[in-house]
């Protein structure tokens, strides 16, 4: 009878007197030996599971490889791609060489992208981060204000980066932050003002420390539950900052300095006709003094040593953007239509008409999606309900005269 009532492990069957510990559950018992065995099994599984390589363990692509990857997704902007490829390579090479080089401190190569709206500034930064497999966060400079004022604090930019990698601080410190519309936070005049400029020069001052490198404190995941809770400490000296802006009017500042097309009377008229043709050439000649005249403070310019100018996209480039990149707009919509077993075709004239429309709107590549979406809206609305539809053909008249696309049905 005593044997029947003796407690034993439900897994191995050993009696209580033969083990050190027997833990009770809702419908059985488990001994310390079985717990240790399970622990060892779980531990061995964890060791066998391959870990995701950290940024430092991954092979760093060369500038040529970075450029080739950018070519797959971004049309044109050859000069900007070369500048970016070298700057990004040097930045991550610096991070990896910190442990090897002790006698020389390598400077940080933050980047300033200058180019018209829709020329590919944001796309370049996003593509770069995706290729390098590093955390990426984007912020709009126009929403930022100094701490204590209505608006978004500059530290929130850092919070977005840490959130993008599930609060893994070490991984976040290898990331890229892109700040758009940086030209909108220029100070209102060249002379320092005695009044507070919380959304212009004030934001530049607030961004300075983050960009040059500091140890910033941000709230932990879910925010601080009580005042004593520790904040997360993030070293921004390893984070690559890329700032971008259209800098409308900067070309006039550069033009004035280099005396391109300067003159009066008839020569002034010739100059105005050549403005668009020389925009990228002028941006390539930009100097720190030009940016100061535009409204960036000297300290801020000094933290962005690498300047990559982008050219205004012409009609030919916009047509290529529609069709050539790996994730080209036309390819995306063709894939959508293929899910309904329908082919989607665009005539060469239709592509040209869309490019011309985007140029007229002055939206660059950014405006192409809204144009394609508008001309295909009615067709996509009816598509799931149309029986035996085989092909949809978009002609130039669909864009220029608002004619519906041609629908071809199976015989």
UniProtKB/Swiss-Prot annotation:
Detail which positions bind ATP.
Answer: 116-123
Domain ClpX-type ZB span(s) in chain numbering: 1-50
Q: Which residues bind Zn(2+)?
A: 9, 12, 31, 34
Gene3D superfamilies named in the record? 1.10.8.60, ClpX chaperone, C4-type zinc finger domain, P-loop containing nucleotide triphosphate hydrolases
| Cellular component terms per the entry's GO annotation | HslUV protease complex
Role of this protein: ATP-dependent specificity component of the Clp protease. It directs the protease to specific substrates. Can perform chaperone functions in the absence of ClpP.
* Record's protein name: ATP-dependent Clp protease ATP-binding subunit ClpX
Query: Which source organism?
Result: Pasteurella multocida (strain Pm70)
């Amino acid at each position: 009878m005593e044997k029947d009532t003796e407690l034993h492990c439900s897994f191995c069957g050993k009696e209580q007197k033969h083990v050190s510990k027997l833990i009770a559950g809702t419908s059985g018992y488990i001994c310390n030996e079985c717990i240790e065995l399970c622990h060892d099994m779980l531990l061995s599984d964890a060791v066998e599971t391959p870990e995701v390589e950290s940024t430092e363990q991954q092979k760093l692509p060369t500038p040529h490889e970075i450029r080739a990857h950018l070519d797959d997704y971004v049309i044109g902007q050859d000069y900007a791609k070369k500048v970016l490829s070298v700057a990004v390579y040097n930045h991550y090479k610096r991070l990896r060489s910190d442990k090897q080089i002790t006698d020389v401190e390598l400077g940080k190569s933050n980047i300033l992208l200058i180019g018209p709206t829709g020329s590919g500034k944001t796309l370049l930064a996003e593509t770069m981060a995706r290729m390098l497999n590093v955390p990426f966060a984007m912020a709009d400079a126009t929403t930022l204000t100094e701490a204590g004022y209505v608006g978004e604090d500059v530290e929130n930019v850092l919070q977005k980066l840490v959130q993008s990698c599930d609060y893994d601080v070490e991984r976040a410190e290898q990331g890229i932050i892109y700040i758009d519309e940086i030209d909108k936070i220029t100070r209102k005049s060249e002379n320092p003002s005695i009044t507070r400029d919380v959304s212009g020069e004030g934001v530049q001052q607030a961004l300075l420390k983050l960009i040059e490198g500091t140890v910033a404190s941000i709230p932990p995941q879910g925010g601080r539950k009580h005042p004593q809770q520790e904040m997360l400490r993030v070293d921004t000296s390893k984070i690559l900052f890329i700032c971008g802006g259209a800098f409308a009017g900067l070309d006039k500042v550069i033009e004035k300095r280099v005396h391109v097309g300067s003159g009066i009377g008839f020569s002034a008229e010739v100059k105005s006709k050549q403005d668009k043709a020389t925009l990228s050439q002028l941006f390539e000649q930009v100097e720190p003094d030009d940016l100061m005249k535009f409204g960036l403070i000297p300290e801020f310019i000094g933290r962005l040593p690498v300047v990559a100018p982008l050219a205004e996209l012409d009609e030919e480039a916009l047509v290529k953007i529609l069709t050539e990149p790996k994730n080209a707009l036309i390819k995306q919509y063709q894939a959508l239509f293929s899910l309904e077993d329908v082919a989607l075709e665009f005539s060469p004239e239709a592509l040209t008409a869309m490019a011309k429309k985007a140029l007229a709107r002055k939206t660059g590549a950014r405006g192409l999606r809204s144009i394609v979406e508008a001309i295909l809206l009615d067709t996509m609305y009816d598509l799931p309900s149309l029986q035996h539809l085989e092909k949809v053909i978009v002609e130039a008249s669909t864009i220029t005269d608002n004619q519906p696309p041609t629908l071809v049905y199976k015989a």
